Amino acid sequence: MNGIIPFVILVLFSSNGLSSAGDSNSAVDIGKPGDAEKVSRTVKLTQMDNMFLPGEVKVVEGETIRFVIKNGGNHKHEMLLGPMTELKKAAEMRRKYPDKEHSEAHLVQLEPGEQKELIWQFTRAGTIDFACPLPGHFKKMHGTIIVEKK
């Protein structure tokens, strides 16, 4: 009996940890759509046909950033924020279903020459990735956002 209670507690904590680790609602982990009136600065990103420029951005926890994204390439591109595991899943889905339309708060779709904005608040310190998940683009078109502690 004495060994059962610690085992049950261990199982309960392990189950809780697994369920949150596998949570598909990654928007909570990467922040949330930001308020345009609370933007602290603007970061310009350019999408070329094989990379993002710059490939790394540093922000501070709690900061609201206005990303101005320009497609400087010759093909349609996307910019999707998320953990790399989720970006890989998105790239696989785009490969399997290339004609399916997507619309997430942490996604921007751009035609060649087009420019759009994404306003995002970074609520937790850590690393967040961004990528173009379109077929043939993902392997080279990705970057990192480093969210530093306040």
Please annotate each region the language model reported.
Residues 69-71:
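Asparagine-centered strand-capping/turn motif at beta-strand->loop junctions
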Residues 78-82:
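Beta-strand signatures of extracellular beta-sandwich domains
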Residues 95-104:
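Short beta-strand and strand-turn-strand segments in soluble, beta-rich domains
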Residues 22-38:
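A eukaryote-biased signal for short, well-structured alpha-helical docking elements
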Residues 6-15:
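Bacterial N-terminal signal peptides
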Residues 35-64:
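N-terminal edge beta-strand
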Residues 85-96:
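Short aromatic-acidic-glycine turn motif
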